[in-house]
């Protein structure tokens, strides 16, 4: 692999607003998404905003997953960044969109830490 990692930036639309505003459901979805990628979960931090919305991060050995929700718009901004080639960030992004009952998603993959020669990092 010539890149240290893959970072998926997803725009998730038409989601179930009740799910987007439920901090416990969002946390569970994000942790399960990390597991779906094959990652090792290290820590989680989630916050419920007033009057609505949730933001959170799942720190994984391979990097992180984040989400920021706007229930009033049925929208979530999702990032899944994984390092190494034993995990697949697309598995996590697709799982999240499915669990949010999204009608539409656009996503972009960014290669992170791109080097001219293949790189090998300890623990990956």
Swiss-Prot record:
The active site is at residues 63, 68, 83. The record marks 62-63 as: Cleavage (non-hydrolytic). SUPFAM superfamilies: S-adenosylmethionine decarboxylase (SSF56276). One of its GO terms (molecular function) is adenosylmethionine decarboxylase activity. The modification Pyruvic acid (Ser) is found at residue 63. Keywords: Autocatalytic cleavage, Decarboxylase, Lyase, Polyamine biosynthesis, Pyruvate, S-adenosyl-L-methionine, Schiff base, Spermidine biosynthesis, Zymogen. One of its GO terms (cellular component) is cytosol. This is S-adenosylmethionine decarboxylase proenzyme. It comes from Caldanaerobacter subterraneus subsp. tengcongensis (strain DSM 15242 / JCM 11007 / NBRC 100824 / MB4) (Thermoanaerobacter tengcongensis).
């Amino acid at each position: 692999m010539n890149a240290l990692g893959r970072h998926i930036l997803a725009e998730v639309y038409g989601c179930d607003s009740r799910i987007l505003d439920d901090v416990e459901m969002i946390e569970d979805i994000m942790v399960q998404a990390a597991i779906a990628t094959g990652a090792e979960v290290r820590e989680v931090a989630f916050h419920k905003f007033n009057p609505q919305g949730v933001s959170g991060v799942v720190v994984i050995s391979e990097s992180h997953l984040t989400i920021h929700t706007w229930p009033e718009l049925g929208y979530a901004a999702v990032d899944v960044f994984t390092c190494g080639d034993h995990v697949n960030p697309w598995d996590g992004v697709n799982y999240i969109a499915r669990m949010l009952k999204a009608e539409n998603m656009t996503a972009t993959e960014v290669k992170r830490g791109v080097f001219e020669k293949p790189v090998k990092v300890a623990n990956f």
